[in-house]
Amino acid sequence: MTMGRIFYIIKADKEIIRTESGGENAMDRYLKETEMLDYSSKNIRQLIAKRKWDRLDAFRRVQAIYNFVRDEILFGYNTDDSIPASKVLADGYGQCNTKGTLFMALLRACRIPCRVHGFTIDKALQKGAMTGFVYKNAPQNVFHSWVEVYLDDRWYELEAYILDKAYLTRLQQQNSGCTGAFCGYGVAVQDLQHPVIDFDRNNTYIQSEGINQDFGIYDAPDDLLKAHHQEMSPLKTFLYRHLGRHLMNRNVKKIRRQK
């Protein structure tokens, strides 16, 4: 696979965001609750109350929620991309699309505007996390997304919440000889040992070098999935849900536990 990132500069529009005062909000559509972004769910409200994220300033709020989704919701494969945020939280694990759904729900519950950007990535990026017949039978183009967050009058592209630090650290240790580009095990970056994964008013990426198709920006994952989704036959979908993802999750756990 020749890695090549499709790069887009997305300029923030001139719409005024007033999330703290409770006044009119010109981008209310980026704060709406949806079927997938079900932030009124009991477990989501309890989590926010426990963590007290809504008491933080906007930057610290985004940073704290980002770190929670990245490191406390472990990298793993759920039953389907369309599950709601409350289910992702209950599962305690997720991948790009499902962790993104939870991230967006938590942000919107805390009055941080956000949207979703859809793509596909080459399946070579998943090699290692996927193995054997699971990898062989996986679609060549894997459905992918990241979350874009509006803060300080600009949009930030955030993707590196996908892999928890414990998993990524093990990959870095197991591939300590790699000092440049790396593609596999859920990673596609220019520099494996120094990827930009921490949010400090910057974009973060962990799979962007594997992008091979851009579907554009949508208000919510519900809208994205109405237009695009993972293309698999009914049989392959059944096998993924009931066998493939369990093998993948077992493999990911094995990597995370290795010393």
Positions of predicted regions on the chain:
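Long, composition-driven mixed-charge/polar low-complexity segments
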Residues: 5, 63, 255-258
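His-Asp-centered catalytic microenvironments across diverse enzyme cores
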Residues: 32, 36-39, 121-259
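Residue-level signal for well-ordered alpha-helical scaffold segments within enzymatic catalytic domains
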Residues: 67-68, 105, 109, 145, ...
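Short, positively charged and aromatic/hydrophobic N-terminal segments
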Residues: 6-10, 14-17
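Extended, folded domain segments that form the structural surfaces/walls around functional sites
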Residues: 23, 33-42, 101-109, 113
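Secondary-structure boundary elements
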Residues: 26-91
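Active-site neighborhood of thiol-dependent amide/isopeptide-bond enzymes
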Residues: 78-138, 142
